[in-house]
Amino acid sequence: MAFFACSPFLFTTVQAAVFSPQSFSLDNGLKVVVIENHRAPIAMQMLWYRVGAADEEAGESGLAHFLEHLLFKGTKTIKPGEFSRTISRIGGRDNAFTSYDFTAYFQRAAAHELETIMRLEADRMHNLVLTDEVVLPERDVVLEERRSRTDNSPAAQLREQVRRALYLNHPYGRPVIGWMSEIKKLTTENALAFYRKHYAPNNAMLIIAGDVSVENVRMLAEKYYGPIPSRVVPARVRPKEPPHRAARRVVLKNVRVRLPSWSRTYLAPSYAAGEKRHVYPLEVLAQVLGGGSTSRLYRKLVVERGIASSAGAWYSGDGLDYGEFGVYVSPKAGGDIQVLENAMVEELAAAIKEGFQPADIDRAKKLISAQAIYARDGIRAGPNAIGQAFTQGQTIEDVEAWPERISAVTPEQVMAAAKAVLIVESSVTSILLPEAAK
């Protein structure tokens, strides 16, 4: 169980695959997708709900992630902990994760156990039972998770502060795991109310992948998910960001930091919102600007100037409401962070002024495609890409058309995207520095 931080690297590669899925809907509104993959006698079930941390009420940060934990605590027919014990007993694996726009649950098991995992997951869609006896101890588990993963990690603390600075009004600015003071106040009643409000078949997508058939999946989906009644689910109405007129800067010093690092994160359009014409060029821009040892930033700052140990760029366009574009660099031991920042700013300005060669753009597109082809072989790649698309405003058709749209990107479009997004007033610069022990 985990809160999910969107990774530009994970989903940039995953979404490029073509999975040839087949889909249908049940009468209660549940969308079902089947991705046949007969390479091994394995089946995977993923259930994606269109609800995440950005759908929480003010003062209840962390509730979506907390509820994810609580779905393993028993139903009217399954005792606390029995869900995962059953999956383990049949030789399978299960887990779940939460992000700003979704909560997802998955199991992987032998293909002949598909009915077992579908029966278990369908049961907790509508039969969850929560009492203080299980909720309050699990709240302590989440509090400890926050302490260990965020409060004891300087890098995680910095990321949290960056998001708070980047989003002036939108709930993407609060942590998925929640603020410590608000987690402490979450109750059994909060969790049950959130569950009843958002966990419904008409607010979910079921994805089955592996050594399965559409006919069998349809039969099992009708048997176990079909009887669950639909509910009225609230519209996802969220506050918008005001115009960003001033660059922001976050500096964190900590005795546990060994080497300094510098990064800058820009607010950007996403696949679902904003200037969507820029999203595919932004994927290519991230690759050509900072996607590896042949990229411009690495070549200029690490190889030619020799002042950095690493440098790169990334794009995360998966948000329902906003995306992000980032650049980063770390100095060599003993290097000066201000010198590094000046060099990065110079290289970004030079890239926008000079543009990119068509050969560089073509190489970047080929690298993205090669990564995508490799990612497609995994059984989880398709469910990840399609599930995330469903919860964040895209369609199966968008996922399937991804390689073609990347291939069509031109150098002119990449430059237009760079000029539109790499605006310092819409950015947060973050610096992580060592601090001498007192």
Model regions and ranges:
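Short solvent-exposed loop/turn micro-motifs enriched in small/polar/acidic residues
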Residues: 15-18, 243-245
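N- or domain-start disorder-to-order transition segments that initiate the globular core
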Residues: 16-41
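Short, acidic/polar N-cap/turn motifs at the starts of alpha helices
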Residues: 20-21, 132, 249
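His/Glu-based metal-binding/catalytic segments typifying zinc-dependent metallopeptidases
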Residues: 147, 164, 233-294
